[in-house]
Structure formats: C-alpha cells, structure tokens
A protein has these predicted regions:
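Surface-exposed helix-capping loop/turn segments at secondary-structure junctions
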Residues: 27-33, 268-272, 314-319, 553-562, ...
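Cysteine-centered nucleophilic/redox motifs
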Residues: 23, 429-431
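Histidine-centered catalytic/metal-binding microenvironments
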Residues: 516-636
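Carbohydrate-binding surfaces of carbohydrate-active enzymes
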Residues: 471-490, 590-591
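Aromatic-lined carbohydrate-binding surfaces of glycoside hydrolases
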Residues: 7-8, 27, 49, 113-380, ...
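Contiguous, structured surface segment used for ligand recognition
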Residues: 1-113
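Short, Φ-rich (hydrophobic/aromatic) sequence segments
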Residues: 19, 75-87, 449-464, 477
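Aromatic-rich surface patch/π-platform used for binding flat ligands and interfaces
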Residues: 383, 432
Length: 636
C-alpha cells in the first residue's frame, strides 16, 4: 500500500493516515492500493474555498483530488463510503468498516452544494468529547466548527462541575484551564482543515478586563459601569448576568475599546477563519440613552461592525466577519450599510419547529413593530424570512446562513424515535436553496446520537447533496447501525414515536399574527389531565420490553461491535422512555404529586447511568432544558 501526499499540509497528512488506517483494516496491511492525494489546482489551498473533490480510482489505484486540503479529507471519506464504510456516530464502535478487496471503479466529482455546513458548540462537554466529535464532522460532510465565546467556559464547566448529576464529584475548572482546553480544540479543528469560527455572544466586556467566568457573572468592573446600556434610568447588569448585558454602543469609549479589542484578538489568533459578532443575549436590554435613541439598534450595530472592519483592514487582517440578525437586530437598518459587503455573511435564526419546518410561504399580515425594549417574538417562519429579505435589500450582503436550533432542545420532543426530527431537518436542508440561504449553522448539543444519529447524519448528507432521497439515507443508516434487524428497529422506533408523539407532548400556543404584535393568548399541555393520552402512554413499557426481547435474540448471533453498540444505546433509551412514559401517564391521569415522583425517578436513572451513553446523549441538556425547564417545569 502506497498513499502519497502530494500536498504535504497538516490536514493532508491526517488524510493520508486516515486512508491508510482504514484500507489496512479493510484489505490488510499489504494491500495493493496506490493512491495519490492532490489538489485540483496545485497553486491554491484555501480553507475558505468551496469544497470539491474528484475521485478517480480503479482497483485501488488512482487519485483523490480536492479544492483544498479539507476537500481532500472529505474525498478520502467519500471513497471509504464508496467501499462500504459508514460513519454513524463519534467514538469507538461508531462506524462500519467492511472487508474489501478494493477492486472496482470509483469515479466521483462532487462539489458541496451549500458552502456553509457549520456545527456550533453547545451543551455540556469537555475537550475530549469535542475532539471526538470534530473527528466525526468531516466524515459527515461538515466544513466549519464554531466555538461560542472566546473561551467556552460555560459549556466546559457544565461537564467538569457535573451539573445536575449527584453521582459525580464536581471538578474545578478555572478560566485559565478552560482556555487551555480551548486552544487544544482550536488546534485540532485546524488540523482537520475545518474552518474555525469564534465569538458570538460574550465579547463586549472583555475590552473592560472582564471575562465571562464565574467571577463576573453578575457584577461590573468600575471601568465598565459608566458604559453599560442605560435602561429604565440606570446603568446596571441586565437579567442578572453580564452575558445578557449590552453596552452603550454609541459611546465613543465603548466603540474604540471594542474595535481595538478585535484588532488585538485577531492578531493573537490569526488562524481564525471567521468571527461571529452578536450583541448580548437576552431581550429588552438595549441602551435607551439620548444618543442611542436617535438610531435603531441595527443601525448602531452596523456602524460598529463597519468600524471593526475598517480597523482590521487597516492592519491587513482579512478574517471573515459574520453579523447576526438576533432579537433587536432582526429589523434591518434604516440608514447604515456595510461598507465592505463582500467581507460578510449574515447569520439569521429562524422561527421554526420539527412539525412545521421551514416554509417558502410569504408572510401575511403586519410585521411586529420595532420598539426599543418591547420584545415581541417572531410569529413564524415566513416572518423570519421577511426579516432576512429586508436585511438583504438594506445591506447588499448576498450570503445568509440559518442559525438552526432543531437539535438544541426541540428534538427532545421527538426523543422517543428521532424519526420526525430527521425527516424535518432533511427536508429543511432541501428547502434552503428555494429560500436563498447558503447553509446552516447547527446550534446544537454535540451529543445527538440517542436513540440514533439519523437527524445529524441526514443533515450532513443533504448539505453536501440536497438531491439525495431521505428514504435512501434512512435505509443506509439503519442497515449499517442495526444490521439485518434494521427493518424491525425502524418499525419499533416509529411506533415509540407514535406513542410519545411530538405533538402530543409539545406545548400548545395560540398566537395572534396581526396588529403588528404577537400576543400569546394561552399555553396548555395537551397531555395534562387527559385520560385518553394516559391510555397511549401506558403502552410504552410493553412496547419497549417486547422489542428488546426480540433484539436480544438477534444479538446472540451478531458479531459486529458497532451494531452491538447501537443496540446497547437502544436498551438504555428504552429504559428512559419507560420512565418518561410513566411520568407522562401520571400527569395525564391528573396525579400531579405522583407525576413529580416519577419525574424524580426518571432524572435519577438518566444521571446514574450517564457513563453508559456519554458520547451519544447529553444528559445534562436533556434534564435541564427538556425535563426541568419545559415538559415538567414546576407549575405547568
């Protein structure tokens, strides 16, 4: 076996090692493969260029060419998929690697349809979990990793502190230690050739010497106090946290400090490919001082981003900038325009869910009024698109990217099967072109492979080629994950998804979409005090047990470790679903006290067994967001 790296970059060295390792597994160490890894244009290796790979291999001999080093790595994994490999999830026993004689012809010329195929850091993680996930991303077709914040201490501490898990001992994590983990994550991202993005929320107070660690959660430095947003007659922390606190962005001191900080930051980290610039998280936290009230928040925001752009350009720094349409900046600026529009692509959250998905329908009615610190939710997906259309017309920026939240917490309503989540996400990716969008940034847990990884697997496949058929992708995934028991497994998960149905447990909200505002009339749980739903939930335990009994008989003869791991996950998933159904049953019968007891049992089981599904299931995010804050929120 001779794998020749003609590019000799860090990424192609990794690609060479990966191809050599897998081919040795498939055909033995002494196989006759002769493959050259090359650039399509030997004079260009730009990580920002669109991905294209050309594979021309016959009987194990030929070339894999790419438009950049990352594209060559993507081409390596595409060739391995052609040979029958399947990359189902991160970690040991997460992939199918069949034996092969490497004979036959592989001719593929693939250009990624969507240039922005982005995964965003969320959930509870450590650097090892993230690096394992990063290894999986190019196998799934993604090209960019976005680390929120300069140092994502908030996500790392959730893991190290083992928040919500009484069975684990908290581990201290200083800001400096989190910064070291961040550097390791950044280095590995670059090794893979993935575009590396940073920031998002959480940069405003860094120029004032305040990081976003525990020391500065709800207090201000003396230097910062005079410069925070003036709201209701005072300047103070908003929402109890500086992460929810804006500055006065018309204040010349603030503007200069932020601009100077960006120059310093990108000089320190010239390897960053992009920075996402978002104002503070939260709502109703924009400055109401006399000067700020002269302009819209979006006009002030564009002026700030222009100042950052000009200063970076003067220093010869050409890192891409990604402004974000978010809360008060949903409305397009009235006067300000980006002076250098080719430097920007705009990130835009979209109001959607796993039932409706994206829509190409035009917004009907009157859009919400833009009134300072009087937050109104975006009514629906067409309204989100109207905001984007207004920004496109006002700024001249061509590239818009959806910031998608399907796999942040909404997918937990489909935790029984993930079938609805997978189909909706795949359909949404196909709709991007009709909506004029250039890709997706998935704001999601890094551990979304429980009970399966079909939603994010299908998303990656569709972002590369939206003409693929979802049914083909689903069958490909299930056959690899569950072997000859794939059909029975799909039927089982589909049935579970019918019993703990996305719509049956999702909050119902009536929304007025006229009059220039969105008024929530009422909000009720469909399953509370609903004996008919109780009858449905009561079927879950027997459904799980009957399937696992059949699956265990099948597993007696199954030898593949990856397939066995898939069924291990289904076992724990089934046990969690039984306990979830028991809690839902008591709530449906109107037994609130007994429901609360069952919820406690559910939480306990999830946390006690966390190590059993560590890489596949974000127990922290599921318990905090879905159980504690949504479905079983006290008082609901």
């Amino acid at each position: 076996m001779i794998i020749s790296d003609k590019v000799r970059s860090e990424t192609t060295a990794y690609a060479k090692d990966e191809l050599s390792r897998y081919l040795a597994q498939m055909a033995g160490l002494h196989n006759l493969a002769r493959i050259d890894l090359m650039l399509i244009d030997e004079n260009e290796d730009n990580t920002l260029s669109d991905d294209r790979y050309i594979i021309d291999i016959t009987d194990g001999k030929g070339t894999i060419k790419g438009s950049n080093s990352r594209s060559i790595l993507l081409g390596v994994y595409a060739y391995l998929k052609h040979l029958g490999c399947r990359f189902l999830r991160p970690g040991e026993n997460g992939e199918i690697v069949p034996a092969s004689d490497l004979m036959g012809q592989c001719k593929i010329d693939q250009k990624a349809f969507y240039p922005y195929r982005i995964e965003e850091l969320e959930g509870a993680v450590n650097d090892d979990i993230i690096i394992g996930y990063l290894k999986w991303l190019p196998k799934a077709g993604f090209n960019t990793y976005f680390i929120q914040y300069v140092t994502p201490h908030i996500f790392l501490k959730r893991w190290h502190y083992h928040e919500l898990n009484p069975y684990k001992t908290p581990e201290p994590l200083s800001w400096e230690e989190a910064s070291e983990e961040t550097l390791r994550i950044e280095a590995f991202t670059k090794k893979l050739g993935l575009q590396l993005w940073s920031l998002g929320h959480g940069f405003m107070f860094l120029p004032f010497g305040m990081d976003y660690g525990p020391e500065w959660t709800n207090k201000l430095s003396e230097e910062a106090k005079p410069h925070v947003a003036f709201i209701n007659g005072e300047r103070n922390v908003s929402g109890g946290n500086i992460a929810y606190t804006n500055l006065c962005y018309t204040d010349p001191v603030v503007k200069k400090k932020i601009v100077d900080w960006f120059v310093s930051y990108l000089k320190e980290k010239p390897y960053l490919d992009g920075v996402v610039i978002i104002l503070a998280d939260g709502i109703n936290n924009d400055c109401e001082c006399e000067e700020c009230l002269k302009s819209t928040v979006s006009d002030i925001y564009v002026d700030l981003v222009n100042a950052i752009d000009e200063a970076l350009t003067a220093e010869g720094i050409h890192t891409k900038l990604y402004p974000c349409i978010y809360v008060a900046t949903r409305w397009a600026p009235l006067k300000a325009k980006f002076k250098n529009p080719n430097r920007f692509a705009i990130v835009a959250p979209v109001n959607s869910n796993l039932k409706t998905g994206y829509t190409t329908d035009k917004f009907q009615g009157e859009m919400p009024k833009n009134e300072r610190n009087k937050y109104v939710p975006t009514p629906n997906s067409p309204a989100s698109m109207k905001f984007i259309e207004d920004w496109r017309n006002a700024t001249g920026v061509n590239d818009f990217i959806f910031n998608d939240y399907h796999l942040y917490s909404d997918h937990y309503f489909d935790i029984a099967s993930y079938m609805q989540a997978a189909k909706t996400l795949a359909n949404d990716v196909q709709k991007l072109r009709a909506l004029g969008m250039k890709g997706i940034m998935n704001c999601k847990t890094q551990r979304s492979f429980f009970p399966t990884g079909l939603p994010i697997y299908a998303c990656g496949e569709m972002l590369m080629n939206p003409d693929r058929d979802f049914e083909d992708i689903k069958n490909e995934y299930f056959e690899a994950a569950f072997g000859s028991f794939a059909k029975e497994t799909e039927e089982y998960l589909t049935r579970l998804g019918e019993l703990i149905n996305y719509e049956s447990i999702r909050i119902k909200t009536d929304v007025a979409e006229t009059g220039g505002a969105t008024a929530v009339k009422n909000s009720v749980w469909a399953w509370r005090n609903n004996p008919e739903m109780a009858k449905v939930f009561a079927q879950v335990p027997n459904t799980v047990d009957a399937f696992m009994e059949k699956a265990n008989k099948y597993l007696i003869t199954e030898e593949n470790a990856t397939v066995k791991r898939s069924f291990d996950l289904l076992y724990y998933h089934g046990e969690i679903m039984k306990r979830l159904a028991e809690a839902l049953y008591e709530g449906a019968m109107g037994n609130r006290e007994e429901c609360d007891k069952k919820v406690a049992i559910l939480r306990d089981y999830i946390m006690k067994n966390e190590d059993a599904y560590l890489l596949e299931f974000d127990a922290y995010l599921f318990v905090r967001r879905f159980i504690n804050e949504i479905i079983f929120k006290p008082g609901t």
